[in-house]
Amino acid sequence: MSLQSNSVKPTEIPLSEIRRPLAPVLDPQKIDAMVATMKGIPTASKTCSLEQAEAAASAGELPPVDVLGVRVKGQTLYYAFGGCHRLQAYDRRARETQNAAFPVRCRVLPATPRQIRMYLGSSLDIE
């Protein structure tokens, strides 16, 4: 959650609809802890205390991922530039449950194609 998305209501988006254009640098132990927490087994990691993990496990969910929603040709494209560990944890749960449309808690911030190009460059053709 960021300052920009703090007031945005969380929604669920299928994992398969979230584009992750940047290669992440991941800590496998952190992902393991998040997956365990999603399963209701609170697990601490380097960046999450046991108390925080217990709160997430009792809620049965991870904090929402900020995504940018871009309207193009009548459909919304979702781009995630952060939340890499949470998205990997959702990806692992999706594979475990064999559900490519596994729901991801997100806060969607509206964006324009021009704004997305600032992140990805002119090679992106979304108009």
UniProtKB/Swiss-Prot annotation:
Record's keyword terms, sorted: Antioxidant, ATP-binding, Cytoplasm, Disulfide bond, Magnesium, Nucleotide-binding, Nucleus, Oxidoreductase
Gene Ontology molecular function: any one: ATP binding
Leading EC class: oxidoreductase
GO cellular component labels: cytoplasm; nucleus
One Pfam short name: ParBc
Cofactor: Mg(2+)
Single Gene Ontology BP annotation: cellular response to oxidative stress
SUPFAM superfamilies: ParB/Sulfiredoxin
EC code(s) of this entry: 1.8.98.2
Induction comment from the UniProt entry of this chain: By hydrogen peroxide.
Reaction equations catalysed: S-hydroxy-S-oxy-L-cysteinyl-[peroxiredoxin] + [protein]-dithiol + ATP = S-hydroxy-L-cysteinyl-[peroxiredoxin] + [protein]-disulfide + ADP + phosphate
Protein location: Cytoplasm; Nucleus
Post-translational modification: Forms a transient disulfide bond with TSA1 during the reduction of cysteine sulfinic acid (-SO2H).
Matches recorded under CDD domains: Srx (cd16395)
Membership in a protein family: Belongs to the sulfiredoxin family.
Function, as annotated: Contributes to oxidative stress resistance by reducing cysteine-sulfinic acid formed under exposure to oxidants in the peroxiredoxin TSA1. May catalyze the reduction in a multi-step process by acting both as a specific phosphotransferase and as thioltransferase.
Remaining remarks: Present with 538 molecules/cell in log phase SD medium.
Name of the protein: Sulfiredoxin
Source organism (scientific name): Saccharomyces cerevisiae (strain ATCC 204508 / S288c)
Gene it is expressed from: SRX1
